[in-house]
């Protein structure tokens, strides 16, 4: 079987040492983090890596922009919390994790991520998935022990996140001394026509249907038009990259087929 990081539909699960933290937005105009969150959590559970997830926060866009109304932004907080809690409960394994609303629970979120940073070492680094604006990462780095920053790696795939901070630039994040881990734009293969997810929509297992529903909520969202007809879990490509090896041969351009293979493999062996 081919096991290169670019080709196979049956990726080898070989995560690097260390823990993972995910910071997502979802309250910004683009609703893609709804599907991205559901897929990210399902991937970690399906590969028995849920215990390595030590922080998850959403709604990290701290300053609302005019492109999304106050009412619509308020809705997104609830939708993102549902994507987190609903996926976690249905798929299981996240009972000891709190899913933070970064904007509404700002102090708690920063404290929790700082704690994860401070627990880092050469043998137990922290991989931070930047699935939204960098501000929460910046605040947590500023509040944590400087000598621990060398053991922090920040994974990114798109400048739209890097450059969207209201308080921190991408360069200011790097200036803390963390390691930048940049992979290609995951929208290429993971923002697709929604018909490519009909297998999930029509799945016999309600856990998979729920994941599909989270992505569908983004498709029918009325704030932006560019998600119409699409099913987008692009940020989850960074999690796929991590669980398949990260900087040691991880899948750099994840596909729907690879996600499907992993999730259906788990569901077939773990019936409700």
Curated annotation (Swiss-Prot):
List the keywords (alphabetical). Periplasm
Q: What induces it?
A: By ulvan and rhamnose.
- State what this protein does: May be involved in ulvan degradation. Ulvan is the main polysaccharide component of the Ulvales (green seaweed) cell wall. It is composed of disaccharide building blocks comprising 3-sulfated rhamnose (Rha3S) linked to D-glucuronic acid (GlcA), L-iduronic acid (IduA), or D-xylose (Xyl).
Q: What is its main location?
A: periplasm
Specify the protein name.
Uncharacterized protein P22
Tell me a GO cellular component. Answer: periplasmic space
Task: Tell me where it resides.
Answer: Periplasm
């Amino acid at each position: 079987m081919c096991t290169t990081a670019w080709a196979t539909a049956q990726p080898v699960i070989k995560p690097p040492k260390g823990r993972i933290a995910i910071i997502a937005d979802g309250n910004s105009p683009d609703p893609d983090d709804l599907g991205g969150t559901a897929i990210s959590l399902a991937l970690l559970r399906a590969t028995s890596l849920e215990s390595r997830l030590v922080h998850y926060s959403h709604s990290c866009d701290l300053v609302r922009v005019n492109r999304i109304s106050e009412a619509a932004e308020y809705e997104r907080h609830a939708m993102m919390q549902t994507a987190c809690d609903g996926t976690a409960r249905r798929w299981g394994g996240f009972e000891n994790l709190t899913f933070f609303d970064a904007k509404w629970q700002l102090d708690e979120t920063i404290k929790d991520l700082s704690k994860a940073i401070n627990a880092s070492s050469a043998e137990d680094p922290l991989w931070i998935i930047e699935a939204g604006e960098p501000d929460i990462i910046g605040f947590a780095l500023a509040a944590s022990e400087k000598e621990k920053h060398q053991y922090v790696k920040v994974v990114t795939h798109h400048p739209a996140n890097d450059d969207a901070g209201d308080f921190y630039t991408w360069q200011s994040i790097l200036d803390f001394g963390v390691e930048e881990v940049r992979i290609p734009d995951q929208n290429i293969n993971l923002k697709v026509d929604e018909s490519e997810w009909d297998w999930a929509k029509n799945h016999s297992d309600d856990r998979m249907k729920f994941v599909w529903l989270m992505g569908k909520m983004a498709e029918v969202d009325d704030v932006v038009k560019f998600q119409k007809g699409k099913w987008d879990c692009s940020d989850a490509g960074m999690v796929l990259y991590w669980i398949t090896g990260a900087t040691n041969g991880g899948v750099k351009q994840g596909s729907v087929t690879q996600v499907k293979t992993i999730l259906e493999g788990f569901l077939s062996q773990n019936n409700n």
